[in-house]
């Protein structure tokens, strides 16, 4: 495999679920935990083709890290002031 570029990674794990919409597949993958006492990472991969079926294992899938920001309204519990919070949703895109 060639050297990884900026914001690129590889993924190995087991397909937990997938759905498709808008011409893309969105596959949820569970990767092995770092050790017996930590939680396994859960990753979502966007692709133009299916990566497999539920329960299939995938290895060294080359992806680019992407994401987007979402804002939401909230009320500060101490002051009662209305404000906006922000979440960042990260997603991996299959390099096809």
Swiss-Prot record:
- UniProt GO BP: DNA replication
Keywords for the protein's UniProt record, in alphabetical order: DNA replication, DNA-binding
Check the UniProt entry and state the signal peptide residues, or none.
none
Q: Does the keyword DNA-binding apply?
A: yes
Q: Which GO terms describe its molecular function?
A: DNA binding
Q: How does it assemble?
A: Homodimer.
Function, in words: Binds to DNA in a highly cooperative manner without pronounced sequence specificity. During synthesis of the single-stranded (progeny) viral DNA, prevents the conversion into the double-stranded replicative form. G5P is displaced by the capsid protein G8P during phage assembly on the inner bacterial membrane.
- Protein family (similarity comment): Belongs to the inovirus G5P protein family.
Q: What is this protein called?
A: DNA-Binding protein G5P
- Gene label: V
């Amino acid at each position: 495999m060639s050297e990884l570029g900026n914001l690129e990674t590889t993924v190995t794990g087991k397909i937990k679920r997938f759905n498709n919409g808008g011409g893309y597949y969105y596959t949820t993958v569970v990767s092995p935990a770092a050790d017996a006492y930590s939680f396994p990472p859960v990753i979502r991969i966007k692709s133009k083709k299916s990566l497999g079926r539920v329960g299939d294992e995938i290895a060294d899938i080359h992806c680019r890290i992407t994401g987007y920001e979402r804002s939401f309204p909230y009320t500060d519990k101490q002051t009662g002031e209305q404000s906006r919070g922000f979440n960042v949703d990260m997603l991996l895109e299959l390099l096809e």
